[in-house]
């Protein structure tokens, strides 16, 4: 309830500010975070968000607002100085190159909602284009559970191929995905990834699940039975054949994989393969992260008064 109510409030605020012609990030942050309860309630009066921002229901309104504020705290770090648009970049067929959406470990918690939103915007922008089997646009997510829930992910995995979309995502373990998307949706997502690559895992539940995904192979086992009688003429040998199903890859084999070794399962009638890769160091072409220049802080009024006082005193003494 709290998350859904927050989404309604955020979308309503964006729509209303756009209609008023003042849809800047700072104005959005002022309305949702800094405004008083009275102004906050008045802003949403007569909109679909009104039931969640009613001044009379201050406890519920405060709880919903607190949930929303915790998710949009990253907006205060954005500046109104760039005309770059992710949607326009996706829609411009002449554009090429890479767009990196990343954050340092100490910034991830704050920027997680923002990076998730950017990724979702990019995926949705692709699926607004005309279908084109010759187009190729890759979405590579290094750690899928490191993001919040991507609303467009399931639809993108099922439909983006006709728009030229290719998605690659990495996870450490299946329970991480379940924690965000739930069991049924997580299973559906993994089914939609046609090509699967599994590296070493030490968790028994995860390795058992991987073994099941890689499948089983049917083998024929011949058993020889001997029978003995009181007379040598009654001795006999009989052969029986049994069909057995065994895992192609045992969980213990997944646990014992070396670094850069993996099992690959491709779509179609291709056998499961074990691969060994060679490590190729990346070339450092530029700095991994460049911090923006801090704006000079304005001097406090008290500091100005003291400074002016000292200047006046020195002037009189001179």
Language-model segment annotations:
Residues 1-166, 180-183, 192, 252-273, ...:
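P-loop NTPase motor domains
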Residues 157-159, 163-263:
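Conserved ATP-driven motor cores of ASCE-family P-loop NTPases powering translocation/secretion/packaging/pilus
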